C-alpha cells in the first residue's frame, strides 16, 4: 500500500485546526446572541474577561520565568567558579550572552518590542503604530526574560503591559471586532498587564484612564472592559503566584497633619528630579543611537557589553543591578545611612539610564520606584534630624517617594498613589502620597516637563519617518544609477 502523502497530513491538520477555531468563535457568538440583548457591548465585556485571564497567565509565566532564569544563571555561575576563578568573572560571559541574544531577537524580529513598549501601545491606540502581536509576544516574552535575567536594571511591568495589550489585539483579530472596540480591548489588555505585574488592579485601571487619556475612547462599555480585564488579571495572578503585596514593608499609621508640608517639599524636589531624569533618558537613547546607527551588529555588541557589565555588578554589587524592587524593603527598613543612600541613588540613576536607554526589552517602572524610595528615605533622614518633633519615622518618606518620582516622570499622580498603596498595602499613607505626588506633578508641569512616554512616542515617530525618508531616497538613487550608467 502506498504511503499517505505528508503534505496531505498537513492539509488535513490545518483544516481541522481552522474548523475547531471557527466552531469555538461561532458558538461563543451564539452564546452572546442568545443571552444578551446588547450584543456588541456584551461581547466586548466577555472578551475583556478572557483577555484579563490571558494577561494574568502571561504575567505569571513571565514572573516565574524571570525567577527560573535568574536561578539558572546563578547556578551556572556557582558551578563554573572556584577559588581561582571568582563568581563575577564567570558571570561576565553568561550574562553577556543572555543580553546579546535579547538584543538580537529584538532587532531581528520585532524592534517595537524594545524598551518598555508602553509608547508603542499609546501609538497603536492613536493608529500611528502597528501591533504585530505574532512577533511581539514571543520576542517580548523571551527577550525580556533574557534581559532581566542577565542582571540589567530593568523592570518587568513594561513587558507585562505590552504583552497584555498584544493579547488584547490578538483577541480583537480573532473575533474580528471593529476599530473602536479593538482599541478598547487593546487598553483592557494593557490594564490587565499592569494590574497583574504589580498586583494592583486599581492602578492598572487608572493608568489607562490617566496616562492614556488622550488615546483612550471613553465610554461606559470601554471603561467596563478595562475594569474587568484588570480585575481578572489580578485574580489569576494571585491564584497562580499566591502573592499579596508585591513589596513587604512596614505598615505605617497616618503621619500628623502638621508634617504634611514636608511631604509637599519632597514632592517639589521630585518634580525637578523627574524633569532631569526624563531628559537624561532621552539623551542616553540619543547616545546609543549615535553609537549603533541602527546596525544590527553594533546593536547586539552593545547588548553583549552591557550584559558583561551587569553580570559582574549582579555579583559584586547587586544593589545597583536588577530592577530594584528587592532593594525597597531594605531601604525603607533603615538598613542604609545617608551617605550610602546618596551613593546608591546616584549609581542606580546611572545603571537605570544605561539599561533602559539601550533599547533592551524591559520597563522603567520598577527602577523608578526604587529611585524614588532611595531619595525619599534620604530626605526623610535629613528631615528627621532637622525636625525631630515632626518626623517620627523616616520610612514614611520612603513610601511617599515611591510614588513621587513616578508621578513626576509619567505625569500620572493618581496612578502613582494607587500603585504604591496596592504594592505595599499602606492604605493609611494615602494623604502623604497624594500631597507628594501632586506636588511633584505641579512642579514638573510648571517647569515645562512632559510625560516620558509621550516624549518617547514622539521620538519613535520621528525616527520612523527619518528611516522611511532614507529608504525612499536610497530606492530612488538605485533606480537612477543604472539609467545614468547606460547613458
Report each predicted region and the residues it spans.
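Alpha-helical transmembrane segments and immediately membrane-proximal extracytoplasmic
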Residues: 3-487
Amino acid at each position: 500500500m502506498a504511503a499517505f502523502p505528508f503534505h496531505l497530513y498537513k492539509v488535513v491538520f490545518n483544516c481541522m485546526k481552522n474548523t475547531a477555531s471557527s466552531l469555538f468563535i461561532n458558538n461563543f457568538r451564539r452564546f452572546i446572541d442568545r443571552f444578551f440583548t446588547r450584543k456588541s457591548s456584551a461581547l466586548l465585556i466577555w472578551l475583556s474577561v478572557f483577555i484579563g485571564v490571558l494577561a494574568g497567565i502571561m504575567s505569571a509565566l513571565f514572573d516565574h520565568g524571570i525567577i527560573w532564569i535568574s536561578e539558572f544563571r546563578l547556578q551556572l555561575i556557582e558551578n563554573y567558579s572556584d577559588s581561582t576563578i571568582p563568581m563575577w568573572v564567570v558571570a561576565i560571559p553568561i550574562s553577556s550572552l543572555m543580553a546579546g541574544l535579547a538584543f538580537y531577537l529584538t532587532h531581528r524580529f520585532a524592534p517595537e518590542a524594545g524598551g518598555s513598549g508602553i509608547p508603542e501601545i499609546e501609538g497603536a491606540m492613536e493608529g500611528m503604530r502597528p501591533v504585530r502581536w505574532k512577533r511581539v509576544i514571543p520576542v517580548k516574552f523571551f527577550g525580556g526574560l533574557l534581559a532581566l535575567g542577565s542582571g540589567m536594571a530593568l523592570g518587568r511591568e513594561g513587558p507585562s503591559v505590552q504583552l497584555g495589550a498584544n493579547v488584547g489585539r490578538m483577541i480583537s483579530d480573532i473575533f474580528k471586532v471593529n476599530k473602536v472596540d479593538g482599541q478598547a480591548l487593546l487598553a483592557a489588555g494593557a490594564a490587565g498587564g499592569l494590574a497583574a505585574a504589580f498586583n494592583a488592579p486599581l492602578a492598572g485601571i487608572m493608568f489607562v484612564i490617566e496616562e492614556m487619556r488622550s488615546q483612550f475612547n471613553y465610554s461606559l462599555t470601554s471603561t467596563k472592559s478595562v475594569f474587568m480585564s484588570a480585575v481578572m488579571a489580578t485574580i489569576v495572578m494571585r491564584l497562580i503566584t499566591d502573592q499579596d503585596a508585591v513589596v513587604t514593608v512596614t505598615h505605617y499609621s497616618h503621619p500628623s497633619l502638621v508634617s504634611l508640608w514636608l511631604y509637599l517639599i519632597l514632592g517639589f524636589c521630585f518634580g525637578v528630579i523627574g524633569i532631569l531624569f526624563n531628559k537624561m533618558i532621552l539623551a542616553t537613547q540619543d547616545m546609543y543611537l549615535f553609537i549603533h546607527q541602527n546596525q544590527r551588529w553594533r546593536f547586539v555588541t552593545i547588548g553583549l557589553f552591557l550584559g558583561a557589565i551587569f553580570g559582574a555588578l549582579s555579583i559584586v554589587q547587586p544593589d545597583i543591578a536588577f530592577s530594584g524592587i528587592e532593594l525597597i524593603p531594605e531601604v525603607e527598613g533603615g538598613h542604609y545611612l545617608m551617605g550610602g543612600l546618596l551613593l546608591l541613588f546616584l549609581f542606580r540613576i546611572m545603571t537605570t539610564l544605561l539599561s533602559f536607554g539601550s533599547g533592551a526589552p524591559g520597563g522603567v517602572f520598577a527602577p523608578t520606584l526604587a529611585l524614588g524610595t532611595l531619595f525619599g528615605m534620604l530626605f526623610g533622614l535629613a528631615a528627621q534630624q532637622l525636625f525631630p518633633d515632626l518626623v517620627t519615622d523616616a520610612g514614611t518618606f520612603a513610601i511617599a517617594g515611591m510614588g513621587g518620582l513616578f508621578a513626576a516622570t509619567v505625569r500620572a499622580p493618581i496612578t502613582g498613589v494607587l500603585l504604591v498603596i496596592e504594592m505595599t498595602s499602606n492604605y493609611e499613607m494615602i494623604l502623604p502620597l497624594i500631597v507628594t505626588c501632586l506636588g511633584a506633578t505641579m512642579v514638573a508641569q510648571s517647569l515645562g516637563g512632559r510625560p516620558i512616554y509621550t516624549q518617547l512616542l514622539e521620538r519613535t515617530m520621528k525616527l520612523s519617518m527619518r528611516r522611511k525618508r532614507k529608504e525612499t531616497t536610497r530606492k530612488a538613487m538605485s533606480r537612477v544609477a543604472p539609467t545614468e550608467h547606460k547613458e
